[in-house]
Each structure stands twice: as C-alpha cells, then as structure tokens.
Regions:
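Short, polar/charged alpha-helical segment
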Residues: 41-52, 62-83
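Generic structural signal for residues in well-ordered beta-strands
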Residues: 84-86, 188, 273-275
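A ligand-binding cleft/hinge motif common to bilobed small-molecule-binding domains
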Residues: 118-123, 245, 251-271
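Extracytoplasmic ligand-binding site segments that recognize negatively charged/polar headgroups
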Residues: 58-73, 87-101, 107-249
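Periplasmic-binding protein-like
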Residues: 155-160, 223-229, 235, 267-293
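N-terminal export and membrane-targeting signals
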Residues: 1-13
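C-terminal region of N-terminal signal peptides and the immediate post-cleavage residues
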Residues: 2, 18-33
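Extracytoplasmic low-complexity, Pro/Thr/Ser/Ala/Gly-rich segments
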Residues: 29-57
Length: 295
C-alpha cells in the first residue's frame, strides 16, 4: 500500500513545487515501496508514469479555496491525467490524523496537509509512524526546523493571520479587541473549533496576544475571554469561504493566503471583502505540514 500512496503523493508534491518539467534519469532497478526520494523511485519520468497508471490521488481536507488548492488540483489532473478526490474538504487537522488512525484502507488518504499543532501525532512514542519517510524534490530548500530529518513530514507553506472584513462595516476593524464592539454584533466569527483546527487556534492566540496576553501557546486566556464576550452578544459565525462570499460572516481572522483567494470570489458575488494585518500584533505561525500516508 505504501507504493500506491508514495507514487500519487510524491508526484503531487513535484507539481506543487512548480517543477514538473524536470526529468531525472531512471535507475536500473527500482523498488518503489522502499523509495525515499525521486531518484530512488526511478526518476521523475518513472514516477509520473506510475502515477498515470494508478489514475487517482486521494487527498483529505484540502478545500479548493484554501491556499490555491483548487488551481493546484486542476493543474495536477491536467498535467498527469490523474483524478483528484478530496475527503471532507472543510475538515480539521485532527480529522486528518484520526482518519489515518482509524479509517479502513479504502478511505485512507495518500497525502495529508495538517497544522503544526498536531504534527507530533504522526510519530507517537512507542508506536510506528503514521507517515512514510520521503524527501520531496525540493528537500534541500526546506529549512531544517520545518521538516523531519528522515522525511516523515515537511513544511509546505505558511502565512500571517489577517483580519478579513466586509467593507460595509463601520468603523473599519483594525485589531482583535475591535471584535467585541457593538457595531459588529452578529457579524464576528471564527474559522473552526480551536481544539482541532490550527487556523482557529491561532486566531485565539492572536486575539490573546493582541489583548495583552502571553505569547505562550499554553496560555490563550485573553483570547478566549474576547471570543466569550463576542459570543455573549450573538452566536459566533463560521468564518469560511462560503459565509464570507455570501455575507453571512463579515469579520474574523484568516490566513492571508486564504483571504487572497476568497476576496475575488466574493467580488464575483457582488461583495467587497478586504483584509488587513492587525495593528496590535501580527502572528506568523510555523508552516503547514505535508506527509505521505504509510497505510
């Protein structure tokens, strides 16, 4: 099963790196089950050939509006003729980990995209890793702090938290403490459950720091207090692409790389969405993590 996961996911990583035109010489003997880089897989041409033969790439929790994944999926299908499927696009990082642990093989993803807060669960003490060691083609360009030395996981992309808001809001929100203002009652939201969603947790952390709290990940008291005050005024709205594009949500934190993709979609629907970095504190978190499933 590792061979199947590796072929599909490793080829996808090549495309994401923007270097699909590179070809590497094939080796004389290839054991794809043991390959830990493109050379050991028989070269890029062989890897692409095997991916085309498989014909599908199973992903999980990678919505089209997230980090330009929609365009990446389309480009992958066009370049290789491989069908991309995505399980639970709007799920959380914890959902991905839980799926790897408990889902039957037919429901297992080839590759995962998770927040750094759950990466330790890929290598549980005393148990076998949930991921396979593989060094993607641009491995040397990834900082050591953003990857496992053996290739069990690696950082792929990252960004800063921005305030996304509907231009109809007045006054214009500029910092986390603005969220509790009565002018924004019923419009403020969060991207998910902070206990399972990396983006949601980082939103609480940013709100905490912006309100004079600690920068320690283990103490987000000030942020929780802020969202509690907001919720006391009106229920929190889910800050996602659909709600922002329809006007159901008008204010919240979001990664800048996601805001950049949602704003054009909202414009097409006749809404003026904007984003700006908070004036009190700008949070840049560690990169999101990719890994190849071992199952």
């Amino acid at each position: 099963m590792r061979a199947k996961r590796l072929v599909a996911a490793a080829t996808a990583a090549v495309l994401a790196a923007g270097i699909v035109a590179i070809a590497t010489p094939a080796t004389a003997a290839v054991n794809i089950c043991q390959a830990k880089n493109v050379k050991e897989a028989g070269g890029l041409d062989n890897l692409i050939k095997l991916a085309k033969k498989e014909g599908k790439l199973a992903l999980i929790t990678t919505p089209r509006s997230w980090a330009n994944y929609g365009a990446i999926h389309d480009a992958y299908e066009k370049a290789f003729g491989v069908k991309v499927t995505v399980d639970n696009p709007d799920g959380s990082s914890q959902y991905e980990i839980d799926t790897m642990k408990t889902a039957p093989k037919s429901k297992q993803p080839d590759s995962i995209d998770i927040g750094p807060l759950v990466v330790a669960q890929l290598t549980p003490p005393g148990s076998k890793p949930l991921s396979s060691p593989y060094q993607v083609i641009n491995w040397k360009d990834i900082p050591n702090a953003a990857k496992d030395s053996t290739g069990l996981w690696y950082g792929n992309y990252g960004g800063k938290l921005a305030i996304v808001y509907n231009a109809t809001l007045s006054p214009t929100p500029t910092k986390a403490s603005d969220f509790s203002k009565p002018e924004y009652k019923g419009f403020v939201g969060i991207t998910g459950n902070p206990t399972s969603s990396n983006q949601a947790f980082m939103s609480v952390l940013a709100a905490s720091i912006g309100n004079g709290g600690s920068k320690n990940l283990s103490d987000v008291t000030k942020g929780l207090e802020l969202y509690k005050a907001v919720k006391a005024q009106a229920p929190l709205v889910s800050v996602n692409g659909t709600n922002l594009a329809t006007g159901a949500a008008k204010l919240g934190f979001m990664w800048d790389f996601n805001a950049l993709g949602i704003i054009p979609a909202a414009k097409a629907a006749g809404l003026d969405l904007r984003f700006a970095y908070p004036t009190d504190y700008v949070l840049q978190a560690p990169p999101y993590i990719n890994a190849i499933n071992v199952k």
